[in-house]
């Protein structure tokens, strides 16, 4: 079964850290997606796959999460591993102990480390000093595990990735947009960032993405025009307008800037007839959260980055996407540890 689950696209990723997709080739990403599909099939068929029995991992969370934590924990248990969760109050990392020292201690006790927090530099340091695979659960710059789930979901719906038109609407300089741009061009897709100009991705990252696109047949387009940006798109994707850790004072400015970039019926109608909608979640698409109620009371906006009509429509595959976090994270841990 081990040989079978690796598949024909198998690559040797043992000992590698998963910090950003820029570190991985198209073929390596393809292997992780194929492996994810195999694990998903096994999970649904009820076939045990405790291939990492006896190993232990630690999850370091400086930012809270539902999907990332649950995905790593369930994936870890399914693979037979022991899982330790540490929140900001449970470790001395960066406060009374340096990142380098913490990394070396954890590397002696655990076989793998997940980090979700603010600093990309911090997760890179953990990888450098721990001596074990480190997985980026999210930083302010990149969100690579989310990208694998997104790619898997898109491929499940269309049957392929290369050549598809992908449009991200909203704050295109955030970690999700950065990662999506790289993920799309790595797989030969056509990525469009549809946002206000001063929220475009950085010039350096765009240049890097275009360099990759030239090799894979993909492309990168930046536009402020919603009609142009969504026309014929196979995938429309958005994220909340204020990132984790940003103060509430940012909301007013961001809402004013991004309201024209809301994913609504008009945007979906302008996209390809078979277009799908993705969102990494959580989403402010109704008034069923305290934060959503606060925003509506202050700004008179019952729906934010996506309308409830689109979110609840048959074109929305956000819960398939959320489930796929677990399968893809399982693939990453297996590939880098076994």
Swiss-Prot record:
Biological process GO terms, please? arginine biosynthetic process via ornithine; arginine catabolic process to ornithine; citrulline biosynthetic process
Q: Molecular function terms in GO for this entry?
A: amino acid binding; ornithine carbamoyltransferase activity
Q: Which domain of life is it from?
A: Bacteria
Q: Where in the cell is it found?
A: Cytoplasm
Q: Which gene encodes it?
A: arcB
What is the enzyme's class at the highest EC level? transferase
Is Magnesium tagged as a keyword?
Answer: no
Pfam families in UniProt: OTCace (PF00185), OTCace_N (PF02729)
The record's annotation in PANTHER family points to: ORNITHINE CARBAMOYLTRANSFERASE (PTHR45753:SF2), ORNITHINE CARBAMOYLTRANSFERASE, MITOCHONDRIAL (PTHR45753)
InterPro entries for the chain: Asp/Orn_carbamoyltranf_P-bd (IPR006132), Asp/Orn_carbamoylTrfase (IPR006130), Asp/Orn_carbamoylTrfase_sf (IPR036901), Asp_carbamoyltransf_Asp/Orn-bd (IPR006131), Orn/put_carbamltrans (IPR002292), OTCase_ArgI (IPR024904)
- Give the organism the record lists: Treponema denticola (strain ATCC 35405 / DSM 14222 / CIP 103919 / JCM 8153 / KCTC 15104)
- Write out the entry's keywords from A to Z: Arginine metabolism, Cytoplasm, Transferase
For this record, an example GO cellular component is: cytoplasm
**Which residue ranges does UniProt annotate as crossing the membrane?**
none
**Which pathway, per its entry?**
Amino-acid degradation; L-arginine degradation via ADI pathway; carbamoyl phosphate from L-arginine: step 2/2
HAMAP family from the UniProt entry: OTCase (MF_01109)
State which Enzyme Commission number(s) the record gives. 2.1.3.3
Record's family?
Answer: Belongs to the aspartate/ornithine carbamoyltransferase superfamily. OTCase family.
User: Any idea what this protein is called?
Assistant: Ornithine carbamoyltransferase, catabolic
């Amino acid at each position: 079964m081990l040989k079978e689950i690796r598949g024909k696209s198998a690559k040797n990723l043992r000992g590698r850290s998963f910090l950003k997709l820029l570190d991985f080739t198209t073929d390596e990403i393809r292997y992780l997606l194929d492996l994810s599909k195999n694990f998903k099939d096994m999970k649904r068929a009820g076939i045990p796959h405790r291939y990492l029995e006896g190993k232990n991992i630690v999850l370091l969370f400086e930012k809270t999460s539902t999907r990332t934590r649950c995905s790593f924990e369930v994936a870890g248990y399914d693979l037979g591993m022991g899982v330790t969760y540490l929140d900001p109050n449970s470790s001395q990392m960066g406060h009374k102990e340096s990142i380098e020292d913490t990394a070396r201690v954890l590397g002696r006790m655990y076989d793998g480390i997940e980090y979700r927090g603010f600093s990309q530099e911090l997760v890179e340091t953990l990888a450098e000093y721990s001596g074990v695979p480190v997985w980026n659960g999210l930083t302010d710059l990149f969100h690579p595990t989310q990208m694998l789930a997104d790619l898997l979901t898109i491929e499940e719906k269309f049957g392929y990735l290369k050549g598809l038109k992908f449009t991200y609407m909203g704050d295109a300089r955030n970690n999700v947009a950065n990662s999506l741009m790289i993920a799309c061009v790595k797989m030969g897709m056509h990525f469009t960032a549809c946002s206000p100009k001063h929220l475009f991705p950085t010039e350096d990252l765009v240049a890097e993405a275009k360099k990759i696109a030239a090799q894979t047949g993909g492309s990168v387009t930046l536009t402020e025009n919603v009609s142009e940006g969504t026309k014929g798109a196979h995938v429309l994707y958005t994220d909340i307008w204020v990132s984790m850790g940003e103060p509430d004072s940012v909301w007013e400015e961001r809402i004013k800037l991004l309201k024209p970039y809301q994913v609504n019926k008009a945007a979906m109608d302008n996209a390809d007839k078979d277009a799908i909608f993705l969102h990494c979640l959580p989403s402010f698409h109704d008034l069923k959260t305290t934060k959503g109620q606060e925003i509506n009371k202050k700004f008179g906006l019952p729906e934010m980055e996506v309308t409830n009509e689109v979110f609840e429509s048959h074109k929305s595959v956000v819960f398939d996407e959320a489930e796929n976090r677990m399968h893809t994270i399982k693939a990453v841990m297996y590939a880098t540890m076994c």
